[in-house]
């Protein structure tokens, strides 16, 4: 049986990575000549657009509806390592936006500032969802898990 992915480990450790990558992209755009006001504006615009796009969808509410129906599992079920889970959470979104930011830097540093803002927005949205996930788990005394990939089935184990 394939090891499960702990959702808390999937969503939380990638947050500082995304934020740092976003700030590095902003600093690089500034170093390549984007004015302070334009770079901050573009960075904020990218973060705001991503945040609004993600926080106004029904995905979060449907996730927690599915979480309420999570299949109970015991401690014997294998769980993927934290390092592997971190790598999984970076692909493809964090890696793709980081690569696009790096590609845009020498071509259009203003676009890179916008993309860096999207990375920061990913961190902000992830922290909102991460907070909701931790609160949900703590109120129920469980940890949520999923199969690797795009599996929709969720599993719950009593918190230790």
Q: Where are each of the predicted segments found?
A:
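Structural signature of transmembrane alpha-helix termini at the membrane-water interface
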Residues: 27-31, 55-59, 103-106, 127-135
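N-terminal first transmembrane alpha-helix
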Residues: 1-63
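N-terminal juxtamembrane cytosolic/stromal segments of multi-pass membrane proteins
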Residues: 1-10, 141-160
